[in-house]
Regions:
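Acidic interaction surfaces
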Residues: 1-189
Length: 189
């Protein structure tokens, strides 16, 4: 008697990793859902087309019938671009931007907060706009003024009375503060 075995392989990216962007895919009819590590899918894709194919396989692994509909009920590290039917192209662009940020030593959460504050038109620009990390706006303002102005030409009595907390308010048109990882990061606008 011959027996037949079939092996069902898990789709790429199945599971949740606390350190990287993930999305939950849910079947409308059955409420069956699975979490997928979007960044893992991106890293294993050669291009946008392959990424879309992997995402389709992920969705197909969750839905129960051809007529079933799916949606994304939740996400992790994707709130800046989240919608229930976010486009695969936007997910891919987000992951490309994240890859650039990680390569330059920035964190996943800083990238997420950066995109959340400035928008998708700033994909890939985190490192170009990055100015530095400071404890607070006063420290940032003092550092910036010391780097850009010739304070030695100003009499000490005036220099010692500069209120750097107020200087920050004048710098807000040129810089933005973003909080992530329990730190304050500053970016040029």
């Amino acid at each position: 008697m011959d027996t037949q075995t079939t092996t069902k392989t898990k789709p790429l990216g199945l599971g949740l990793n606390d350190d990287y962007p993930a999305i939950c895919i849910q079947d409308y009819e059955t409420n069956n859902f699975q979490w997928f590590n979007v960044y893992e899918i991106f890293q294993n894709s050669d291009d946008l087309h392959e990424f879309k194919c992997f995402m389709n396989k992920a969705r197909e692994s969750v839905i129960t019938s051809v007529s079933s509909e799916w949606f994304y009920p939740d996400c992790q590290y994707l709130h800046s671009i989240y919608s229930e039917h976010i486009d695969d192209s936007e997910l891919y662009d987000y992951c490309e931007s994240l890859e650039d940020a990680l390569a330059d030593g920035h964190s996943v959460s800083l990238h997420e907060e950066f995109i959340g504050a400035l928008g998708t038109e700033y994909f890939g620009m985190l490192s170009d706009m990055y100015y530095g990390e400071f404890d607070n706006t006063k420290e940032f303002a003092e550092h910036h003024i010391e780097e850009t102005e010739d304070l030695d030409s100003i009499p000490w009595i005036i220099r010692s009375n500069i209120d750097y907390s107020n200087v920050w308010y004048d710098l807000q048109d040129d810089f933005i503060e973003i909080e992530a990882d329990r730190s304050n990061y500053f970016f040029k606008r």
